[in-house]
């Protein structure tokens, strides 16, 4: 048996201050659930041997997973144009939160085909799972300039922190108790 459900929500409001300046935010939320159960019965199937474990007359298994994601990107965008010059400045911040939890269970020899559920009393039982949460937060700025659409220059800078950096980080800038990486670019 398989049950799968998903929910997504995305909102992106925008406010125009004038024809050159606007602010916008993108908010996204996703929830995903996955539940699976399987059963190999005793009746109609042969007993099988599991290497290094033993003989199995039937098998019950279950898998459950839930993933929850949250994303937000808020920015302000300013553009200047005249006959020869074009300049665009963008600055904002992003936040990401992702949480994934799963469990997998398996057991053998339920005793009869009327008890297809996984329980602690089954032979050769195996249980595993994952519980992973990570977050990241970034400030960013970008500047694009061109002269008569012939000569271009672009520069950007982002400052990001994430739980994936870990706690034993020596590089970057330490602010508010966490380490931030600086990522400049020019082209």
Give names to the regions the model predicted.
Residues 92-94:
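N-terminal glycine-rich FAD/FM-binding segment characteristic of electron-transfer flavoproteins
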């Amino acid at each position: 048996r398989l049950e799968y459900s998903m929910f997504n929500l995305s909102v992106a409001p925008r406010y125009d201050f004038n024809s050159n300046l606007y602010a916008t935010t993108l908010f996204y939320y996703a929830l995903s659930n996955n539940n699976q159960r399987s059963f190999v019965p005793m009746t109609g199937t042969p007993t099988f041997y599991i290497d290094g474990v033993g003989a199995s007359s039937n098998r019950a298994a279950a898998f459950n997973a839930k993933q929850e994601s949250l994303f937000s990107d808020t920015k302000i965008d300013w553009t200047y144009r005249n006959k020869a010059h074009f300049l665009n400045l963008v600055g904002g911040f992003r936040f990401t939160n992702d949480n994934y939890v799963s469990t997998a269970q398996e057991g053998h020899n339920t005793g009869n085909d009327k008890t297809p559920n996984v329980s602690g009393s089954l032979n050769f039982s195996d249980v595993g799972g994952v519980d992973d949460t990570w977050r990241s937060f970034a400030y960013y700025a970008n500047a694009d300039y061109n002269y008569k659409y012939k000569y271009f220059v672009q520069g950007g800078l982002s400052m990001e922190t994430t739980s994936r950096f870990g706690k034993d980080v020596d590089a970057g800038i330490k602010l508010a108790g966490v380490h931030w990486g600086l990522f400049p670019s020019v082209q």
